[in-house]
Curated annotation (Swiss-Prot):
Protein's recorded name: Glycerol-3-phosphate acyltransferase
Recorded name of the encoding gene: plsY
Lineage per the UniProt record: Bacteria, Pseudomonadati, Pseudomonadota, Gammaproteobacteria, Enterobacterales
GO CC annotations, alphabetized: plasma membrane
Catalytic activity line of the entry: an acyl phosphate + sn-glycerol 3-phosphate = a 1-acyl-sn-glycero-3-phosphate + phosphate
Subunit description: Probably interacts with PlsX.
Signal peptide: none
Transmembrane segments: 4-24, 53-75, 80-102, 112-132, 138-158
Bilayer disposition of the protein: Multi-pass membrane protein
UniProt keyword annotations, A-Z: Cell inner membrane, Cell membrane, Lipid biosynthesis, Lipid metabolism, Membrane, Phospholipid biosynthesis, Phospholipid metabolism, Transferase, Transmembrane, Transmembrane helix
Family designation: Belongs to the PlsY family.
């Protein structure tokens, strides 16, 4: 069991290390998300850079690279503790990708994918929490933070045996959002639609001249 679990942890890290945001931006001829916008290679930044379809692709593939390793581990009968380590490995790969000089994203979509095999009802609650918070506040990061804080309680309600590994995953996501928390506290965080609205205003001004 330990050999299989360790193998799955390595596999999960390598899956997580495939930075979909960087690859998709290259294919779509969008700016490098690591050096443009917020500097975060994730779906929200890709959306800010002007690619709705590209952002959707990033989101889907980021979810899958967290979901697939955990799903395989779940099918192999790994206990909750080891499944938690597999999930964390996938997120660590996304955050510190070995294939992209260890400069990765925040791990939110990958964490969501890693939680999905526990149950679709839980996944629905997580997505709903993120969407509701993000739409009401305009801050994608706040949606991620609130979802990470609530996730262990959701899991405890539905499948308590997975509470500890999900709590570890939530801690990782919250640590990655330390800078966002600081900016939110000081009122300096960018809203989801702020950059796109600014670009539209510039386009309107240019069209008048």
């Amino acid at each position: 069991m330990n050999a299989i679990a360790i193998g799955m942890i390595i596999f999960a890290y390598l899956c997580g290390s495939v930075s979909n945001a960087i690859l998709i931006c290259r294919l779509a001829r969008l700016p490098d998300p690591r050096t443009s916008g917020s500097g975060n290679p994730g779906a929200t930044n890709v959306l800010r850079l002007g690619g709705k379809l590209a952002a959707a692709g990033v989101m889907v593939f980021d979810v899958l690279k967290g979901m697939i390793p955990v799903w395989i581990g779940y099918g192999l009968g790994l206990p909750p503790f080891w499944l938690g380590l597999v999930a964390i490995a996938a997120c660590l790969g996304h955050i510190y990708p070995i294939f992209f000089h260890f400069r990765g994203g925040k791990g939110v979509a990958t964490a969501l994918g890693a939680i999905a095999p526990i149950g679709y009802d839980l996944s629905g609650l997580m997505i709903g929490t993120w969407l509701l918070t993000a739409l009401l506040s305009g801050y994608s990061s706040l949606g991620a933070i609130v979802s990470a804080l609530i996730a262990p309680f959701y899991v405890w309600w539905f499948k308590p045996q997975f509470t500890f590994p999900v709590a570890m995953l939530s801690c990782l996501v919250l640590l990655r959002h330390h800078d966002n928390i600081q900016r939110l506290w000081h009122g300096q965080e960018s809203r989801i639609w702020h950059r796109r609205q600014k670009d539209r205003d510039i386009d309107r001004q240019q069209s008048k001249h």
